[in-house]
Amino acid sequence: MAPITVKRFGRRGILAAAGAVSSGAITGFPTVWAQNIKNVTLRQFGTGVSNLNAVAEKVKQDLGFTLTMTALDTDAVTQKAVTQPKSYDIADIEYFAIKKVFPTGVMQPMDAKKIKNADKIVPIFTKGKLSPDSAMAQGTTPYSVGFVDGPAGKTFAHGQTGWMTLIPTIYNADTLGIRPDLVGRPIGNWKDLVDPAFKGKASILNIPSIGIMDAAMVMESIGTLKYADKGNMTKPEIDKTIAFLIEAKKAGQFRAFWKTFDESVNLMASGEVIIQSMWSPAVAAVRSKGIPCKYQPLAEGYRAWAGGLGIAKHLSGLELDAAYEYINWYLSGWVGAYLNRQGYYSAVLETAKQFMSPDEWGFWIEGKPAASDILSPEGKVMEKAGAVRDGGSFTERMGKVACWNSVMNEDRYMIQKWNEFIAA
């Protein structure tokens, strides 16, 4: 079992444990390299969503070296990446955070030619949208911060190059979670979050850069405000959004403001909250308790997020080779299937499919009714036979992204105003 240091501070939570699918080790290394790599330890840190014990254990089994992991919340990840660049080798970081981190020079651009499945990465990351017909979403799109011009680049390129800031690994489309047995009526819009009918039974997440995006989706849904770019608000737009939230708070609309996966699960499972900002695996966690919970598709579309693996600037030699091998292994299918089974999406769907049953693939990716019970990576029943994934297929869900999690130009001002809302 690989040594692992996991400090839990929330951020999309973990459904840890190894899946039943086996994976062949990547081979073809020189013998000396294969022997030496056993002595390598790579230190990875990032958000809890993909800092998984099962991945560290599988790395040891398949690649032979040791991967240690530390899980932090989003803000702590960004701070550590910039202020403690020698304390990690691999950063598992979200794309909207890389907008802050990469220009500081603490990470090195990655050579796309060394990534075996680079040409199979979902076009959201390599072309900016899912299909040629898809609309460009607002916010910090992964494509806009995904490339730099060269091996020493710090400035984001306007388009695809051979040098990547992160290798994408995980992403999803977020919406509202509801208790269909308690809301008492159909839910179809973001504005339903602030319907007075749910006074004292609603919740919004207290991560400023994400919570304010949910608030913006609500305000546009109501028709109160039309943003030029929800992901890059002006000061007047921030002021109006926060004033709206404070008014709703003072009216008693919100039961709580959650920061962690477990908090969101407990609020919904207890019935204290019946409509809230939520993450897909948290909905699944509520359902696993036998409690009705739905990840509700909404007319205005989804708010999306994505993360990837980046390499620290100081990494070189055998450790750098090991990092590239790890990233190639990550995209080779086993991890992708594991993440897909949690309700996320993998960056290379083609390889993940090889590690999923036709029924799993049909349910999670194609939006088909489950032919048999759908199991989580640890073997628990997540959905009963006949169930259909909320929101449908991969194309239906990721094709309806309205905005991406973002870092605004007025980020500091936004956080200051958000804190005023929480304190109000």
Language model segments and positions:
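Alpha-to-beta junction loops
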Residues: 84-92, 106-108, 198-200, 270-275
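N-terminal secretory signal peptides
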Residues: 1-9, 22-23
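Early extracytoplasmic/lumenal segment of secretory-pathway proteins
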Residues: 35-104
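Extracytoplasmic ligand-binding site segments that recognize negatively charged/polar headgroups
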Residues: 50, 102-263
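Extracytoplasmic/periplasmic substrate-binding proteins
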Residues: 253-316, 353-356, 360
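Mature extracytoplasmic/periplasmic domains
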Residues: 34, 312-389
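Conserved C-terminal helix/tail region of periplasmic/extracytoplasmic solute-binding proteins
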Residues: 378-424
